[in-house]
Every structure is written in C-alpha cells, then in structure tokens.
C-alpha cells in the first residue's frame, strides 16, 4: 500500500491510497469464502452454489466488506505514518473494486490548523466602568414585593380593570369549529399582560363577574401556530371571578421576611451589593470576550467546519433547554433549528477561533495547569470546606469528562490572566 497527502487548505487534507492488485484479489477471495459458507441460494445446498452465482447475488455485500476491510487496514496506518490527527470523519471517494486490479481511494479529513500566534502582547481593549444604579435596586425590591404578593377576590358584580386578574372559562372557534388548545376552565389571566392575542384582554376589561361575552378576533399574521395565523376566530367567554393583587409595604417588617435583615435599609444595601457583584462579573466576562476578539483580529485563522458545527449544536441545545424552562419553543419565537444555526454560525466560528488561539498562546508561552491549580480550584468549589473537599475530589476523579472540562477551564483562565497582564485597557461607560 502506498499513500500520499495533499493539503487542500490549512484545515483539510486529502489522503490518497493505492492498494496492489494482489492484495485486492486476496481480500476479495477471503470475503468470498466467508460469504460462500453461509450463502443461501435457492436450488443449492448452503456453501455449494457456484462462485459466479454467489458473486451475482451478494455483489453489494462483498464489495462493502472488502472496502471496509481494506479501509481499516490502510487508513489508520496512514494517519500514523503521516502524523495526521483528524477532527472529522473521513469523506471517502473510491474506484470500483475488481480482481487483479489495483484499488485506489481517497479519504478527506479536517484537521486543526497549525497556528503561529502573534501580536498577543499589548492588546488594546475597552473595559466598562461600573456605575451604581439606584433604579435597579428599586426594580429588584419591586420584584420581591411581587413575589410576596397575594390575590384578593373582589365582590360579585365588580368590574374588570386593567391590572386585575380575571378567572375565565373560554372556548375558541375557527370556522365554527373549536380548535385545539383554544379552550380552558377557571383560567386566571392578568389583564394587560399581553399573554393572549391582541384584543382578547381588552374586551374582558369592563365585564362584570358572572357576565358572558362572545368576541370576534383575528390571529396575527405572524402567530406562532401557522394553522391559526391570520385567521378570524370567535371566543365565548364567561367571567367567573375577579382578583386584585395586593403588595406588601416596603418596611422593616418586609425586610425581616427576606432574611437576616433588621431594617429595609439593610435589605437595600444587600441588593446593591449583589447587583454590583453581578455587574462586575458581567464586566469581567465582557472584557475577556473583547480580549479574545482582539486576538482574533490580530490572527486570522481558518477553522474546521466540523468544530464549528459541534459548537453550534452545543449552543442550540443550550438555547432549547433555556426555552424549555420557560415552557417555550423555537417555533413560538418565530425560529427553527436551521434559522438559529444561520444566525449564530459566526458566533460559533469566533468561539472556536478564540479557543484555538488561546491554546496556541498557552503552548507558545509554556502556560500549563499544575496539580496545585487543580487543588486550589477544587477547594474553591468545595467552598473552603475540607470535609466537602473530599466529596468534590471524588466526583472529579470518577468523572473523566468533568475533570477534562475543569482543566480546560483553568488553562483558559491562566492564558486570559497572562493576556490581561500585558493588555492596554481603556475605561468606558456603559452604553
């Protein structure tokens, strides 16, 4: 067997193979003999059919087995010989396999690019400055009040207003026929929330408890359910109850219910402290993203599409999980998997580029993760608790993938710290 390598690009190689005729014939005979022993052809005892008939009936099976055997014998040997480390499955292009004829085929694979990273010292990046925002504290307090609120039923004959919670029975019809998902009993709807199609909540405003109404509405043209989009519908609605939300007062008593706080001032201060920490964490992540982007701009590299596709798939799964937690789907957001991938492909490509460039900097600068780095991180994960540390260590010892991810994260942190150490950082206010 002979093999040659052609570089199609910095991330794609084509390996061409030629297998001698005698080796091809030998493999065909070996595969034929295995098939002959189990071949069941009408009119012949098993293993007794003539070769020409067996080859006619089992041609596809024979060719597949021969190709598989020759591939496994030559492909991995060539990878080792040429020191090729694929990140993708091979794309095979082959000639027809014939007795007494040399067999040629090619395997095209993607590989990591060889990166000579440069200009990574003194990267110029802008860092956002943290600015306290009292309105955020007030917003968080209001959210806490909302969480501690309760609903009080209004007396019979009350009139529904914007902001009230209406308890309704309803049935929706399209072309006079109830449609799937268009009915419910004792459904609690906050008027003005915009949860229903335009016009639905507005027509409940002004109704009295015990009142019924039939309303005509049109589904929006861009409605997530394409079977209903743009169609006219009738809803029969009965308003059975009206509730009003009552919020607790912002006082020391409220603060005490939120934890170990004696006064509302202490609670405000804690919220402000947590907000500052969250913002500083966000600012840090944003700065690191800017460093990676600056590194990419200084080092234009090609990356394997296989790695980009994998990153996209991870991003897709994460997005679907986040939506599922909110009981939403891509379709409800006017998207699908293909449109998501098209929208975020450049983001995924830059993430792959950034990861490879950070690895290249680490290699060039001799930055590595020591056992002491791992011990320190494990103790941090354990919250500084020596007893908990044992359980944390046990988890990472038994989960190889988790440990590899931890080491990769630590390596990235060390490289980022190195790059930030030489970066030229300018301050900027939040946009």
Swiss-Prot record:
Keywords: Cell cycle, Cell division, Chaperone, Cytoplasm, Isomerase, Rotamase. Consists of 3 domains; the N-terminus binds the ribosome, the middle domain has PPIase activity, while the C-terminus has intrinsic chaperone activity on its own. It catalyses: [protein]-peptidylproline (omega=180) = [protein]-peptidylproline (omega=0). SUPFAM superfamilies: FKBP-like, Triger factor/SurA peptide-binding domain-like, Trigger factor ribosome-binding domain. It is found in: Cytoplasm. PANTHER family: TRIGGER FACTOR CHAPERONE AND PEPTIDYL-PROLYL CIS/TRANS ISOMERASE (PTHR30560), TRIGGER FACTOR-LIKE PROTEIN TIG, CHLOROPLASTIC (PTHR30560:SF3). One of its GO terms (cellular component) is cytoplasm. It comes from the Bacteria. It is an enzyme of class 5 (isomerase). Residues 163-248 form the PPIase FKBP-type domain. The gene is tig. GO terms for biological process: 'de novo' cotranslational protein folding; cell division; chaperone-mediated protein folding; protein transport; protein unfolding. Its EC number is 5.2.1.8. This is Trigger factor. NCBIfam families: tig. It holds the Pfam family Trigger_N. Its main location: cytoplasm. GO terms for molecular function: peptidyl-prolyl cis-trans isomerase activity; protein folding chaperone; ribosome binding. Involved in protein export. Acts as a chaperone by maintaining the newly synthesized protein in an open conformation. Functions as a peptidyl-prolyl cis-trans isomerase. Gene3D superfamilies: 3.10.50.40, Trigger factor ribosome-binding domain, Trigger factor, C-terminal domain. Belongs to the FKBP-type PPIase family. Tig subfamily.
């Amino acid at each position: 067997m002979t093999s040659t390598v052609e570089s199609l690009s910095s991330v794609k190689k084509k390996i061409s193979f030629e297998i001698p005729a005698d080796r091809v014939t030998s493999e065909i005979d070996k595969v034929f003999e295995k098939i002959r022993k189990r071949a069941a052809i009408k009119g012949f005892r098993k293993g007794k059919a003539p070769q020409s008939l067996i080859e006619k009936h089992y041609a596809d099976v024979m060719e597949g087995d021969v190709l598989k055997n020759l591939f496994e014998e030559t492909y991995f040997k060539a990878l080792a010989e040429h020191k090729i480390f694929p990140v993708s499955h091979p794309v095979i292009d082959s000639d027809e396999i014939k007795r007494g004829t040399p067999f040629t085929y090619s395997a095209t694979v993607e590989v990591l690019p060889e990166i000579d990273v440069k200009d990574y010292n003194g990267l110029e990046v802008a860092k956002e400055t943290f600015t306290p925002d009292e309105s955020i504290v007030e917003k968080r307090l209001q959210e806490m009040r909302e969480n501690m609120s309760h609903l009080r039923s209004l007396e019979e004959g009350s009139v529904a207003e914007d902001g009230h919670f209406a308890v309704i029975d309803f049935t929706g019809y399209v072309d006079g026929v109830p449609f799937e998902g268009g009915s419910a009993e004792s459904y609690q709807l906050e008027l003005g929330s915009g949860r229903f199609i335009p016009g639905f909540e507005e027509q409940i405003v002004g109704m009295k408890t015990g009142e019924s109404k039939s309303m005509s509405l049109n589904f929006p043209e861009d409605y997530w359910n394409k079977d209903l989009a743009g169609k006219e519908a009738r809803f029969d609605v009965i308003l059975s109850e009206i509730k009003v939300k009552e919020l607790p007062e912002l006082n020391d008593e409220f603060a005490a219910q939120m934890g170990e706080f004696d006064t509302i001032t202490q609670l405000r201060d804690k919220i402000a402290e947590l907000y500052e920490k969250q913002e500083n964490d966000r600012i840090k992540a944003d700065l690191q993203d800017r460093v990676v982007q600056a590194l990419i701009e200084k080092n234009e590299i090609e990356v394997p599409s296989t790695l980009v596709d994998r990153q996209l798939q991870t991003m897709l799964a994460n997005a679907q999980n986040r939506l599922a937690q909110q009981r939403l789907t891509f379709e409800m957001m006017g998207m699908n998997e293909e449109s998501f991938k098209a929208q975020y492909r450049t983001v995924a490509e830059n993430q792959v580029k950034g990861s490879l460039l950070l690895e290249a900097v680490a290699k060039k600068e001799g930055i590595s993760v020591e056992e002491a780095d791992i011990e320190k991180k494990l103790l941090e994960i354990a919250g500084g608790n020596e007893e908990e540390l044992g359980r944390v260590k046990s988890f990472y010892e038994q989960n190889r993938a988790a440990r590899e991810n931890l080491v990769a994260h630590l390596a990235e942190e060390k490289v980022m710290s190195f790059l930030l150490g030489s970066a030229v950082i300018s301050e900027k206010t939040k946009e």
